[in-house]
Amino acid sequence: ELLRTPIRLLAGLLGKVIERQAGAETLQTIEYLRQGFIEERNNPDPERRAALMRTIAALDNDRLKHVIRGFSLYFALANLAEEDLLRQKRADLRARGGELWEGSFRHTLQQCRDNDLSPEQLTELIGQLRFIPVFTAHPTEARRRTTMSVLQEIYRHCATLDHAPENSPAWNHAVAETADLIDLLWSSDEVRSRKTLVYDEINNGLHYFNVSLFQAIPQVYRNLRSALNDIYPELEKMVLPPLLRFGSWIGGDRDGNPFVTHQTTEQAVLVHADNVLRYYSKQLKHLRKRLLHCSSIIAIDPAIDARNEHYARLGVTVFDYNPEDYNNEPYRRLLALMRAKIQHTNRYIQSMGEDQAAAEHAYPNAEAFLDDLILIRNALKQHDPEQARGDIQDLIRLVRSCGFHMASLDIRQESTWHTSVVADLFAHAPNLPDYNALDEASRQQALTQLIAAPGAPLLFEQNLSPETQEQLALMRTIARLRELVGARTFGSYIISMTNRTS
């Protein structure tokens, strides 16, 4: 019943939209089929099933399209209602402070305590934990990002509908907004009208970071920290390792796909970096509005002023409108400088290292950015420990998880491609045998000797096959992006369909 109520509300709003947009007869057809198949599932009847199938077969193309669309939106809204109910149950469980669901941090840590796992053993165990969800481009996910964003808005309104009294101004407003959004869903393309490009797939991955993961990652660490403090208070001072990281195959998984090239891989990494660095910039701006501490009122660690002085050359540009701005608010001054440095970092990365003006003030790596954040957090601990445990700590944990790369890109290509490339390199290099003519043992011996050698034969790349030139370009791109963005920019290099070592 808890699920039927919101589904009934959302379905009612959808029904009004269908009646207005596609006509009462379409709505009646959808309801007839819905009720009929519910009855058929509960009490199978061959005659009823045949009648339902005849109804579907008799629909003209336009009516059939509307019926399919109606069911598609109905199930999308029903899924939202179910997700919202599960969210409510988890929130109620947390609010009561009772036993949480199996697999939660609190439940798992309590099991560790009950089974006499010592704090030292738990520290070692947590230090070994790595949870790395990997995004893949699923060809079955044809929904546009726009559609997913509208569904996300409806989901947010569901929270209001859960808590506001029925027919109250807040409830009525949420109903009206939800009805407008359902109308928008009906009126817009649910799927793309063109073939999905790799760039579309890359941007789809960004959607989940922007609407959910950037906010959820720090909360995961907060939940773990809270559970540890309650169940293992001896570990209150333990620094949580970056156990949560992300991977992606989108833009790296070629596996015989000619549309995924080294340019695609470069684009994927640059888009990832741009997205996460823009988010960091936004968070630094937010922190600048929170850390208003004035040095004329409280004592602030001199290390903050020293860091501001270290960035004085950048400050000439950042504070050109007023060189004295934030002089008595050292945190705000440093955060403004850090935000400028993050923006320079993004420009430098997006230029593939060509923008030397940006390079002067760019962070050399995510660790240098972390160093500034940790400096601020440690200074706050001396006079405002609550702030030190707040948003600044969340950002530190996010940077430890996502770096400047956001998600480590895995590279995948099939073994026959690599065999062809290696054979081509052998064929165009002096003093190397015909790779294709070698047996497995000879191939391994030749490759081992080349890998162990201090250098490689001089190659005339213009004579190489397009596939070999593409592979060399990919390897150079990987090396350059690792240098620019960070060592964790790429994850695994996967050679698929292998059947021998060479």
Give the role of each language-model region.
Residues Q471-I478:
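Well-ordered, non-membrane alpha-helical segments in soluble/globular domains
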Residues G455-Q462, P466, R480, A487-S502:
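Long, K/E/R/D-enriched contiguous segments that form extended
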Residues E1-A452, S465-E470, T489-S492:
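Often metal-dependent polyanion-binding catalytic scaffolds in large enzymes
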